[in-house]
From Swiss-Prot:
It comes from Rattus norvegicus (Rat). The modification Phosphoserine is found at S6, S142, S155, S156, S247, S441, S442, S445. The modification Phosphothreonine is found at T51, T85. This is Heterochromatin protein 1-binding protein 3. Component of heterochromatin that maintains heterochromatin integrity during G1/S progression and regulates the duration of G1 phase to critically influence cell proliferative capacity. May play a role in hypoxia-induced oncogenesis. One of its GO terms (cellular component) is nucleosome.
Length: 553
């Protein structure tokens, strides 16, 4: 054991210089390799990774010392290059592995960026798709409330709160003004998107604002309670403004193409067709004189008659039910003539859904009906309005791109006959006025005819009075002839009584009575003559009085 320990002690110090020399040789080789390579990072990696095997070798040598130094040198020199060579390819293999990882990261980043861009685009599209309700849309109360709830508050096309307040006050106005309760109910019912039940402060702020401006006046109560009235503006400044405007040349009011488009779509849409229920609804609403609700058979008979004549085509259904389509000869429809046929024509044209139109037809319509000052500028405005309406959700482009293709109305639009065919309605109103005038004139003539009947009825009982008067005249006329001295004096009387031609027939009758009567009747004649001559003028009366005195004497 002692010999072993001594040998171990002698061998161990000898092995140390050999190991140190091997390390130095190895370090020189590593320096040469590092100079040859272009990557500076490998030095640190090699130094860190090469140290552990040397320590292991040292430990192994300490644990298992060998007697031969040459063998140790050979082993160390052989084992070290074997351990050194394999790490190089592993590092080189690690580098290409790192490169695909970085590529994968870049690809993932690019994919995330594309996803974000797609999300942004989708959000922008959603913002564009959000619909607002146009002013021309004909919706029922339930449809309007539903649409207003669906549309966002910011993009809803309602007026400002001040305008809504004045509108509500005018609508709810009574003798004592419009109460706040009635105003609140009106706004909640008509503008549900305001959500005034939760946000009551909007009404209070609007009331305060309008009171300060002097637009409204508080009749009763204080603060945000009581009754309010809209202050009427004086008309004098308006008159002066109108005079100033009248002095200058009045330019034609420019019509917005936004308001023109729905009517253009209804007129230009082809083919025009509508169901029986829609036709009946329209006719009963705008033509109450026809009484379609009470007498639906009239409408059914008119539809069947139009189909038989070839003025309409029945696409679906049988009899008077189903869908009917208008037929045209050129641009004019075949249907027309009577009031019922005209009502059916306007109903089918108005209730046709969906309403579509091409851009070429729209251009032609705008240039013909709304040419403006410059046609090119008008086409530019049409393009801009189409884009605006498409963003607002009023129109939808079915085919084509940009300023070409076909567009469709997204909301229903049912115009009245006066808007659809204003010329025909004006002609019809003139005809109706003429008919009414004729009826009134006939009624007046009928009213004028009965009065003569009444006069006759009144005259018939008065006939005996006339007879008595004639008898008195007959009795009076011969009495006038009796005094012979008076004929020369009383000459103006025949001028006042021209009907002397009739007297001869009447004069002949009393003559026999005078002959028949005895002489005793002469005493009665002067009394009668005195009574009747009292009716004569003053001169005659005085003369008659003198004669009466003479006769008495």
């Amino acid at each position: 054991m002692a010999t072993d320990m001594s040998q171990g002690e002698l061998i161990h110090p000898k092995a140390l210089p050999l190991i140190v020399g091997a390390q130095l040789i190895h370090a020189d080789k590593l320096g040469e390799k590092a100079d040859d390579s272009t990557m500076p990072i490998r030095r640190a990696v090699n130094s860190t990774r090469e140290t552990p095997p040397k320590s292991k070798l040292a430990e192994g040598e300490e644990e298992k010392p060998e007697p031969d130094g040459s063998s140790e040198e050979s082993i160390s020199t052989v084992e070290e290059p074997e351990n050194e060579t394999p790490p190089a390819p592993s590092r080189e293999a690690e580098q290409p592995k790192g490169e695909p990882e970085s590529g994968e990261k870049e690809e993932s980043k690019s994919a995330e960026e594309t996803k974000k861009e797609e999300k942004d685009q989708s959000k922008e599209k959603e913002k564009k798709v959000k619909k607002t309700i146009p002013a021309w849309a004909t919706l029922s109360a339930s449809q309007l409330a539903r649409a207003q709830k669906q549309t966002p508050m910011a993009s809803s096309p309602r007026p400002k709160m001040d305008a809504i307040l004045t509108e509500a006050i005018k609508a709810c106005f009574q003798k004592s003004g419009a109460s706040v309760v009635a105003i609140r109910k009106y706004i909640i019912h008509k503008y549900p998107s305001l959500d005034l039940e939760r946000r009551g402060y909007l009404l209070k702020q609007a009331l305060k604002r309008e009171l300060n401006r002097g637009v409204i006046k508080q009749v009763k109560g204080k603060g945000a309670s009581g009754s309010f009235v809209v202050v009427q503006k004086s008309k004098t400044p308006q008159k002066s403004k109108n005079r100033k405007k009248g002095s200058a040349v009045d330019p034609e009011p420019q019509v917005k193409l936004e308001d023109v488009l729905p009517l253009a779509f209804t007129r230009l849409c082809e083919p025009k067709e509508a169901s029986y229920s829609l036709i009946r609804k329209y006719v009963s609403q705008y033509y109450p004189k026809l009484r379609v609700d009470i007498r639906p058979q009239l409408l059914k008979n008119a539809l069947q008659r139009a189909v038989e004549r070839g003025q309409l085509e029945q696409i679906t259904g049988k009899g008077a039910s189903g869908t009917f389509q208008l037929k045209k000869s050129g641009e004019k429809p075949l249907l027309g003539g009577s009031l019922m046929e005209y009502a059916i024509l306007s109903a089918i044209a108005a209730m046709n859904e969906p309403k579509t139109c091409s851009t070429t037809a729209l251009k032609k319509y705008v240039l013909e009906n709304h040419p403006g000052t410059n046609s090119n500028y008008q086409m530019h405005l049409l393009k801009k309005t189409l884009q605006k309406c498409e963003k607002n959700g009023w129109l939808e482009q079915i085919s084509g791109k940009g300023f070409s293709g076909t567009f469709q109305l997204c909301f229903p639009y049912y115009p009245s006959p006066g808007v659809l065919f204003p010329k025909k309605v004006s002609d019809g109103s003139e005809d109706e006025d003429e008919e009414e005038d004729e009826e009134e004139s006939s009624e007046d003539s009928e009213d004028e005819e009965p009065p003569p009947k009444r006069s006759l009825q009144k005259k018939t009982p008065a006939k005996p009075q006339g007879k008595t008067a004639s008898m008195k005249q007959r009795g009076a006329k011969p009495a006038r002839k009796v005094p012979a001295a008076q004929r020369g004096k009383v000459r103006p009387l025949p001028k006042k009584a021209p009907p002397k031609a009739k007297t001869p027939a009447r004069k002949g009758r009393p003559a026999p009575s005078a002959v028949k009567k005895p002489s005793g009747s002469t005493s009665k004649k002067p009394v009668a003559n005195a009574r009747k001559e009292a009716k004569l003028p003053g001169k005659g009366k005085s003369a008659m009085k003198k004669k009466s005195f003479k006769t008495k004497k």
